[in-house]
From Swiss-Prot:
Cell wall formation. Catalyzes the addition of glutamate to the nucleotide precursor UDP-N-acetylmuramoyl-L-alanine (UMA). InterPro entries: Mur-like_cat_sf, Mur_ligase_C, Mur_ligase_C_dom_sf, Mur_ligase_cen, MurD. ATP binds at residues 115-121. Its main location: cytoplasm. This is UDP-N-acetylmuramoylalanine--D-glutamate ligase. The keyword Iron does not apply. It is found in: Cytoplasm. Its EC number is 6.3.2.9. It catalyses: UDP-N-acetyl-alpha-D-muramoyl-L-alanine + D-glutamate + ATP = UDP-N-acetyl-alpha-D-muramoyl-L-alanyl-D-glutamate + ADP + phosphate + H(+). Belongs to the MurCDEF family. GO terms for biological process: cell division; cell wall organization; peptidoglycan biosynthetic process; regulation of cell shape.
Length: 442
């Protein structure tokens, strides 16, 4: 079936990295189409890279262009509930995202991962281990390279990280294996409630052959009403079932059906949440028919991703930890649960809170030798959580204030539990700035 048969005019909504990848893909694969780009920002990122013959409208919506479109490709950051998008849908015109276009074009097996936390680490490590097992693999989606740009690479397997936003506009993605890692409160400024958010995540199983779900979080299990009778479920968790954890030779081991795979202490990744992440990777590789035993040496040497519990400076016995990727409550909870700090923990929290409730942090913080440093637009929301809480405007102000107090055994950790958009372009920019400050003051 030729999906493009009746499509002549395409409007791409939102430029940036994703929008540019859509324009490049359409230009290369469907040169007959008339492509126009709308971005409501006055100077959108990537505007200088847009080919000069592509019509561009910035600073507002262009209702006339949307009214003429046969297909609208929207950025995942734009909610389907947006009135202009609703008007397009009411006309019976399809509104898709870049992942749906990828699904139309991909001709190799695809593994995809979603969840509130851990999906970037799982995606990256799945790709690293697949390559180590001799399967040429490309990694992207919501992490690093846009999905459509992966189609340029000669590979045998694609591994995609998918956000709930991306899944909302995806309906044709056939997966050899799909994982739903966990569900915790996030993006409540976008969704009507937790069930709304969960339903978006569950879309990952729509055309999946195997589904990897979390025994410790039943919310990750698909509902039978979804009509996915052909979906074969594989589970992971902290007990000894399927992909799990056993006691073997007096210590904790990762296991499959109670057979030992690897001692937990052999992992370079820190924290219990990362043991779960590794179990998911082993499950996904198994579902894709890849013998993970060939990649265990790569697993043992894997140190994780930048901005995720990453030690960026270690001087005079003081550790500086960049966990800028902790853009929600559960990420920060996970980081704190796996923590080993001999002295005082200086914890930097705050930013754009996305309407979340941070009170569940209070009992965790109460157990720590802590100085809570609250900054950014929603820093005030953290002030009632600990007696030590101090308010700052910017991250720089925090570091300047605490640096004279630091002693050997202390840890300075950025794990903000918030998005970065109040003061930074993204979580990477925030983490890079923290790393700069760490090197300066360490």
């Amino acid at each position: 079936m030729d999906r493009w048969q009746d499509i002549k005019q395409v409007v791409v909504v939102g430029l940036g990295i994703t929008g540019l990848s859509v324009v490049r893909h359409l230009r290369k694969t469907q040169p007959q189409l008339q492509v126009k780009v709308i971005d409501t920002r006055p100077t959108p990122p990537g505007v200088e890279q847009l080919p000069p013959d592509i019509a561009l409208h910035v600073g507002s919506w262009n209702d006339a262009w949307l009214a003429e479109a046969d297909l609208v490709v929207t950025n995942p950051g734009i909610a389907l509930a947006t009135p202009q998008i609703q008007t397009v849908l009411a006309r019976g015109v399809a509104v898709v995202g870049d992942i749906e276009l990828f699904a139309w074009a991909a001709d190799k097996p695809v593994i995809a991962i979603t969840g509130s936390n851990g999906k970037s680490t799982v995606t990256d490590l799945t790709g690293v281990m697949a390559n180590a097992c001799g399967v040429k693999c490309a990694i992207g989606g919501n992490i690093g390279v846009p999905a459509l740009d992966l189609l340029e690479q000669e590979v045998e397997l694609y591994v995609l990280e998918l956000s709930s936003f991306q899944l909302e506009t995806t309906s044709s993605l056939h997966l050899v294996a799909a994982a739903f890692l966990n569900l915790s409160e996030d993006h409540m400024d976008r969704y009507q409630g937790m069930d709304d958010y969960r339903q978006a995540k569950l879309r990952i199983f729509q055309h999946a052959k195997h589904g990897v779900v979390n025994r410790d979080d039943r919310q990750t299990y698909p509902e039978t009403s979804h009509g996915q009778q052909s979906l074969a479920l594989v589970t992971f968790g902290s007990d000894d079932k399927e992909f799990g954890v056993i006691s073997h030779q007096g210590e904790s081991w990762l296991s499959y059906n109670q057979q030992p795979i690897l001692a937990s202490r052999e992992l370079k990744l820190v924290g219990q949440h990362n043991v779960a992440n590794v179990l998911v990777v082993l499950a996904l590789l198994t579902c894709a028919g890849i013998d993970y035993r060939k990649g265990l040496s790569a697993l043992k040497s894997y140190t994780g991703l930048t901005h995720r519990c990453q030690v960026v400076a270690d001087n005079r016995g003081i550790k500086w930890v960049n966990d800028s990727k902790a853009t929600n409550l559960a990420s920060t909870q996970a980081a704190l649960s796996g923590l080993n700090c001999a002295g005082k923990l200086y914890l930097l929290v705050g930013g754009d809170g996305k309407g979340a409730d941070f009170s569940p942090l209070k009992p965790i913080l109460a157990q720590l030798n802590l100085q809570l440093c609250c900054f950014g637009a929603d820093g005030d929301q953290f002030m009632p959580l600990h007696a030590s809480a101090t308010r700052f405007e910017r991250m720089e102000d925090v570091i300047e204030h605490i640096s004279p107090q630091l002693q050997s055994g202390d840890m300075v950790m950025l794990s903000p539990a918030c998005a970065s958009f109040d003061q930074f372009s993204n979580f990477m920019a925030r983490g890079d700035r923290f790393a700069e400050l760490a090197r300066q003051y360490a």
